[in-house]
Amino acid sequence: MRRRILLASLILAALSHPAKAVGDPAAGEKVFQRCRACHQIGESARNAVGPKLNGLFGRPAGSIEGYTYSSANKSSGIVWDEPTFRDYIKGPQAKIPNTKMVFPGLKSDQEIDDIVAFLKQFDSDGKKK
């Protein structure tokens, strides 16, 4: 009887704590192909239609030197962390109305997991960590 209770308790504990999302950087690189029309990443990245995305996580929105951001983006007060980026990439205009970003967003949680894993590989100099 004790074993059944212990087993049931372990199962309930496991179910009450969802697994942390894990993305595949290689799959994220494929998802990033949709972003390449406007953004670059890596050691030779430059600002283009959109800002370069090196070292995205941990930096304030609207802070890449040499890129002209919308006033909405600059005044958003956002510091890019994983939860904020996940919310943003689902619908950029919903998260920051009047942002220059016209991309409609990613709808697949797996694609979002993957692109996060891909972007997190790059430091602010575009080097893979």
Describe each model-derived feature in a short phrase.
Residues 37-45, 58-59:
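Detector for the c-type heme attachment site
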Residues 47-52:
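Short cysteine/histidine-rich zinc-coordinating motifs and their immediately flanking basic loops
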Residues 15-32, 43-44:
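Electrostatic cytochrome c docking/interface patches
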Residues 63-83:
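Short Fe-S-cluster ligation motifs
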Residues 1-6:
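Bacterial N-terminal signal peptides that target proteins for export
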Residues 8-14:
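Bacterial N-terminal signal peptides
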Residues 81-129:
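C-terminal capping alpha-helices of c-type cytochrome domains
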Residues 33-41, 115, 119:
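The canonical Cys-X-X-Cys-His
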